[in-house]
Amino acid sequence: MTANTGEPYKRHSNESPVDRNINVNAIQSDKFLSLLLSMVPVVCQTGQEERLKKVNGLTPIGYGFNIRTDQHLEFHNLSEPNYLGNGLHCSSLCSTNYDFDGYDYCDGINASETDAMLQDSRSSADGDKDALVEGSKKQTKESSIAMALQILVPFLLAGFGTVSAGMVLDIVQHWDVFKNLTEVFILVPALLGLKGNLEMTLASRLSTAVNVGKMDSPIEKWNLIIGNLALKQVQATVVGFLAAVFAVILGWIPDGKYQLDHAILLCSSSVATAFIASLLQGIIMVGVIVGSKKTGINPDNVATPIAASFGDLITLAILAWISQGLYNCLGSYAFVSPLVGVFFLAMTPIWIVIASKHPATRTVLHSGWEPVITAMLISSIGGLILDTTVSDPNLVGIVVYTPVINGIGGNLVAIQASRISTYLHLYSIPGELPEDAKGCYHPCRTFCGTGVNNKSAQVLLSLVIPGHLIFLYTIYLMKSGHTSLTPIFVAVYLLAALLQVFALLWIADWMVHHIWRKGKDPDSFSIPYLTALGDLLGTALLAISFHILWIIGDRDGDVGD
């Protein structure tokens, strides 16, 4: 595609296909880079663009897509008999009075990868239409029980992963680097939030691609995978560096001073952790998506929880190990910290070149930074709350529960966001909401009703209390933490967790539809915001809960002491 160049496409009826492979002669002087680039397939660019040119009635112009009214009607007539969503499908969406020729799908220059990855699924060949019909049938046949059973196992796996992360954090908080360089605590929610910024976004994006039939071709599948992994590494490196800079600033504000070697250590630890953890989790996530497709499981239900099942544990363990190692080198090997940071930052241009070669990720590479960076800033504020709370010796018990409440809330809201996004991709067009999705968003609209999105919200909310009870009891059996499970503590903790997920699901219902109405892809834009809000809400509510428990006299701290 050339949507990012602003050059229009024109249909050629009797001309031979145009070769649009990217010329990399300009960089062939670097033999290593040339070898690396030669390993990356670029066939999908030619294939996708030529299919777009051959589509009857579709002429992409710049950032927008002009669609003929009769073709749009044909698409909706095809999918309309299978529609069993939140309400009756309103035919006004396909009214001939609507000016489709003048409609800009991508809302100006803010084009999203929805168009690069999914645009021909709305108007291309019959095979794509069949894939849409098949996907909608799968969704309409999914009952609440089947949905709950599919979500339950990965939800429990993700929960035990967050429990493990909390236990690790409870141990490493006593390490020298965490005691002498408390700004590391500010990094914890931001780096763990990369799971929501990157891993869950990747899972949701690929899940949507699977459900609309865009990963049926092996060439398209591997081009999507390689492009998304390269994009994720770029984002992880940049966000890791910015998170460290923000942590240094937040640590400098209270006292008005900082040490340069500590600032370099934070930056190097953050960048290295983000890069390594993101690469490992990305490979795992690709395996989960491909495996779900082969086994017939809806990846929307399992991909996002599994993306977080061991993500927190891996990220936290890598952060603790690298930061402690670099801290030990401060005295005699001071050059190690800057060397580590420079090494990982120097690899960023390579990933940028690879990601820019794939149409599914090229647009996100230019316009997808806003949600990722904003989410990092929101998570860092949660980290500041955690750092302040941990500094109080009476409230150290919060450490073991913070990854649990944040991780569970982020997992559940990511599932809901991914399902709503898939629903919109199947039954609507970017920039236009279904008739039943218009109006004011309130809790009753989110949780009351018989639509597929209402049912999923009900199922996810019902998992909060039993899930957290299991995880609390697991922490108790493992003798971890500094707080006993008194009835008052359990009640206050469960109330905080329930309020967090309730608010997140409500916000997700509004945010996903709002982003879709703006012509952007909710898979890339909503999940980072939602998981970051989950981190902030979870940490804040947990801190308030511990303060309340301390005030009313529930101060037992013998467990794990």
Curated annotation (Swiss-Prot):
Residues 172-183, 255-270, 323-333, 386-394, 479-487, 553-561 are cytoplasmic. The keyword Ribosomal protein does not apply. Keywords: Cell membrane, Ion transport, Magnesium, Membrane, Repeat, Transmembrane, Transmembrane helix, Transport. The keyword Transmembrane applies. One of its GO terms (molecular function) is monoatomic cation transmembrane transporter activity. InterPro entries: SLC41_membr_dom, SLC41_membr_dom_sf, SLC41A1-3. GO terms for cellular component: plasma membrane. One of its GO terms (biological process) is cobalt ion transport. The chain crosses the membrane at residues 151-171, 184-204, 234-254, 271-291, 302-322, 334-354, 365-385, 395-415, 458-478, 488-508, 532-552. It is a multi-pass membrane protein. It is found in: Cell membrane. Residues 1-150, 205-233, 292-301, 355-364, 416-457, 509-531 are extracellular. It catalyses: Mg(2+)(in) = Mg(2+)(out); Mn(2+)(in) = Mn(2+)(out); Co(2+)(in) = Co(2+)(out); Ni(2+)(in) = Ni(2+)(out). Belongs to the SLC41A transporter family. Acts as a plasma-membrane magnesium transporter. Can also mediate the transport of other divalent metal cations in an order of Ba(2+) > Ni(2+) > Co(2+) > Fe(2+) > Mn(2+). This is Solute carrier family 41 member 2. It comes from Xenopus laevis (African clawed frog). The gene is slc41a2.
